[in-house]
Amino acid sequence: MTTRIDTRFADLKQQGRPALVTFVMAGDPDLDTSLQILKALPAAGADVIEIGMPFTDPMADGPAIQAAGLRALKAGTTLKKTLGLVRDFRATDNATPLVLMGYYNPIYIYGVDAFLADAKAAGVDGLIIVDLPPEEDEELCLPAMKAGLNFIRLATPTTDEKRLPAVLANTSGFVYYVSITGITGSASADASAVGAAVQRIKRHTNLPVCVGFGIRTPDAAQAIAAQANGAVVGSALIDALKASLDAEGRATKGTVGAVADLVASLAAGVRGAKQAAE
């Protein structure tokens, strides 16, 4: 199967440049604004969009993304409504890859088969589920592949040579390398260490490797993207969104623009990086 993710990375490889992968939380700060933000991202320079599925117990997320999830839940965002956002986005954009990112519990409650069918029909391309290790591939990873969705795995600095083949075995789309240990948004990534780690992963897979956690500025995005096939930015976008809200936490006229402007500057940084050697 060839997904939008595969097509996008193949196109970027031909262009000789890395991807900018952006993360936003579905329904933050409300569903209407969230849809406007999603629609603004590709024009601002996002190549792939990760959409967070709000969850009440997001253990791998730092304070910014946790707060975004709480805002989304408060606004009434559910997994069904998240899929509705994807459907609405697809009405005007059939090319930009969309990846749902989050935890297994809401999917389990929704029902795996129903979720996969609805996600595929809505226009989802891939999943990143942070709390399902390879040992549990039968739960969701293998059914997702059968449904035509990429299942994207996280690798970390502590994923050793012995563990990597298991992590990569059923991975598709791209590999998401978490450049620092800990929670999202908590430190900055070191470009030279990232480069060595990406090369280590590439000895085990032909998939693109994208690097996330700790990228907040165009310069950092450029430095990291130069070492990989893409840079993932999340917490910095959530912070920009939050800074644009009013005292009650509601969207203002500047909310969509605040996120889009930061994405445009990050995209310029990433586009200034040459594609890492394959």
From Swiss-Prot:
GO terms for molecular function: tryptophan synthase activity. InterPro entries: Aldolase_TIM (IPR013785), RibuloseP-bd_barrel (IPR011060), Trp_synthase_alpha_AS (IPR018204), Trp_synthase_suA (IPR002028). The keyword Translocase does not apply. Keywords: Amino-acid biosynthesis, Aromatic amino acid biosynthesis, Lyase, Tryptophan biosynthesis. Coiled coil: none annotated. It catalyses: (1S,2R)-1-C-(indol-3-yl)glycerol 3-phosphate + L-serine = D-glyceraldehyde 3-phosphate + L-tryptophan + H2O. Pathway: Amino-acid biosynthesis; L-tryptophan biosynthesis; L-tryptophan from chorismate: step 5/5. Pfam families: Trp_syntA (PF00290). SUPFAM superfamilies: Ribulose-phoshate binding barrel. CDD domains: Tryptophan_synthase_alpha. Transmembrane segments: none annotated. GO terms for cellular component: cytosol. The active site is at E50 (proton acceptor), D61 (proton acceptor). Its EC number is 4.2.1.20. PROSITE patterns: TRP_SYNTHASE_ALPHA. The keyword tRNA-binding does not apply. Belongs to the TrpA family. The alpha subunit is responsible for the aldol cleavage of indoleglycerol phosphate to indole and glyceraldehyde 3-phosphate. HAMAP family: Trp_synth_alpha. PANTHER family: TRYPTOPHAN SYNTHASE ALPHA CHAIN, CHLOROPLASTIC, TRYPTOPHAN SYNTHASE, ALPHA CHAIN. Tetramer of two alpha and two beta chains. This is Tryptophan synthase alpha chain.
